[in-house]
């Protein structure tokens, strides 16, 4: 047999075997996926959490600005937390997420560790640290506790050909998937493109039926202070990661300024 024909036959065999291997692996993965047990459904929230306290008593956690000082065309970036008082929606959502994580950490339900990572050279906002999250059991059914539970499952599950099942979730993934669950829970009629606005709306709807006690403010502030006292670098990494995740999600959302609105 001429060398050229032998080479063609050889490569045909290699390609055929490669296609067969991919088909077998794909078939096995499909069978596993079809026969995998359904994940238990996470019940709806039924108790207040730190995020509810921050939203309900926002003036005690964030600086407010008089409504009259903000031009009407810029007010879409703000949330009215009291009569004539506004806070930036992104800052409010950031504090709600941070307070919820601090409360769950104080209760021993979440643990964190910070690891170094290479920042993205093409992203000026990219971080050089990564926060990994461990969760031992389902979190309390607060609005964010429920969404964190769903987000943790998604962030740690195996992805075919990409990764095995994880024992820890990357905080960026956890927050992103939790905010996706917030949007899904709101439904397409109520959900907006802005993830921070969706979170505020989601918790505000819960607060319409369940009000946190006024004494809860001290508990939430105590959890935040305890986290900073335990490890200030960790607290800063948590806040920076939450801020970066909200920023990254906002890049995917249309900006009213860019649209001329």
Residue ranges and their predicted role:
Residues 177, 181-261:
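Short hydrophobic helical membrane-anchoring segments positioned at the boundary
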Residues 13-23:
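Core hydrophobic alpha-helical transmembrane segments of single-pass membrane proteins
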Residues 1-15:
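Feature marks short, highly hydrophobic, charge-poor N-terminal signal-anchor/signal peptide-like helices
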Residues 23-199, 254-257:
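Short, amphipathic alpha-helical interface elements at domain boundaries
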């Amino acid at each position: 047999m001429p060398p050229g024909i032998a080479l063609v036959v050889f490569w045909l065999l290699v390609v055929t075997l490669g296609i067969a291997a991919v088909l077998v692996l794909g078939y096995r993965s499909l069978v596993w996926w079809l026969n995998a047990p359904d994940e238990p459904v996470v019940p709806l929230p039924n108790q207040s959490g730190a995020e509810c306290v921050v939203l309900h008593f926002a003036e005690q956690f964030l600086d407010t600005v008089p409504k009259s000082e903000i031009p009407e065309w810029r007010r879409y970036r703000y949330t009215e937390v009291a009569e004539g008082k506004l806070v930036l929606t992104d800052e409010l959502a950031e504090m709600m997420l941070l307070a919820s994580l601090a409360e769950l950490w104080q209760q021993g339900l979440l643990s964190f560790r910070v690891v170094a990572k290479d920042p993205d050279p093409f992203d000026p906002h990219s971080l050089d640290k990564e926060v990994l999250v461990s969760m031992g059991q389902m979190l309390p059914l607060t609005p964010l506790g429920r969404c964190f539970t769903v987000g943790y499952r998604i962030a740690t599950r195996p992805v075919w050909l990409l990764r095995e099942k994880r024992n820890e979730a990357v905080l960026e993934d956890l927050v992103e998937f939790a905010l996706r669950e917030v949007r899904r829970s709101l439904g397409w009629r109520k959900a907006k493109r802005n993830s921070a606005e969706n979170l505020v709306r989601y918790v505000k709807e819960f607060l319409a039926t369940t009000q946190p006690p006024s004494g809860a403010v001290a508990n939430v502030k105590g959890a935040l202070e305890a986290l900073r006292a335990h490890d200030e670098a960790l607290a800063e990494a948590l806040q920076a990661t939450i801020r970066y995740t909200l920023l990254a999600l906002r890049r995917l959302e249309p900006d009213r300024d860019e649209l001329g609105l």
